[in-house]
Curated annotation (Swiss-Prot):
Residues 84-87 are annotated as: Connecting peptide. Belongs to the beta/gamma-crystallin family. Keywords: Eye lens protein, Repeat. The keyword Plastid does not apply. SUPFAM superfamilies: gamma-Crystallin-like. Has a two-domain beta-structure, folded into four very similar Greek key motifs. PROSITE patterns: CRYSTALLIN_BETA_GAMMA. Crystallins are the dominant structural components of the vertebrate eye lens. PANTHER family: BETA/GAMMA CRYSTALLIN (PTHR11818), GAMMA-CRYSTALLIN D (PTHR11818:SF124). GO terms for molecular function: structural constituent of eye lens. This is Gamma-crystallin D. InterPro entries: Beta/Gamma-Crystallin (IPR050252), Beta/gamma_crystallin (IPR001064), G_crystallin-like (IPR011024). It comes from Bos taurus.
């Protein structure tokens, strides 16, 4: 079970709203979000309702302003609790529909370019666990939540291009 609290003002001030499960529309409860406290679980927060728009991965901890989660503004409109998994396994393909060279990953990778000479991934298959895909190396840039399932094209995970820099397993160990 997870727990996340959203605050309208920086430094955990102002009106707040607490969640313990997925919420597709936070707009009725908060006009803006400038700080977040994650008491338990791993969460993905989204700038738009219905889990759309830019997304940001949050682990247990305090985020006193939106820049701490690399947000560009004070808009948080939906959130999703990421289920914990014991093991993680992911297959990446250089072409759409699982074609081309394939690599399998079971650990975090800070640079796909350095480790595998890949900087574009056109399809992938999450076999176990949840992952966060980052557009840039060293866990930077746009973030995308990957849950178990098939992603035949980069549009399937919400990306606008096939650029992939790094991958991180969702593990709540902190």
């Amino acid at each position: 079970m997870g727990k996340i609290t959203f605050y309208e003002d920086r430094g955990f001030q102002g009106r707040h709203y607490e969640c313990s499960s997925d919420h597709s529309n936070l707009q009725p409860y908060l006009g803006r979000c400038n700080s977040v406290r994650v008491d338990s679980g791993c969460w993905m927060i989204y700038e738009q309702p219905n889990y759309l728009g830019p997304q940001y991965f949050l682990r247990r901890g305090d985020y006193p302003d939106y820049q701490q989660w690399m947000g560009l503004n004070d808009s948080v409109r939906s959130c999703r609790l990421i289920p914990h998994a014991g093991s993680h396994r992911l297959r990446l393909y250089e072409r759409e529909d699982y074609r081309g060279q394939m690599i399998e990953i079971t650990e975090d990778c800070s640079s796909l370019q350095d480790r595998f000479h890949f900087n574009e991934i056109h399809s992938l298959n999450v076999l176990e666990g949840s992952w966060v895909l980052y557009e840039l190396p060293n866990y930077r840039g746009r973030q995308y939540l990957l849950r178990p399932g098939e992603y035949r094209r980069y549009h399937d995970w919400g990306a606008m291009n096939a650029k992939v820099g790094s991958l991180r397993r969702v593990i709540d160990i902190y």
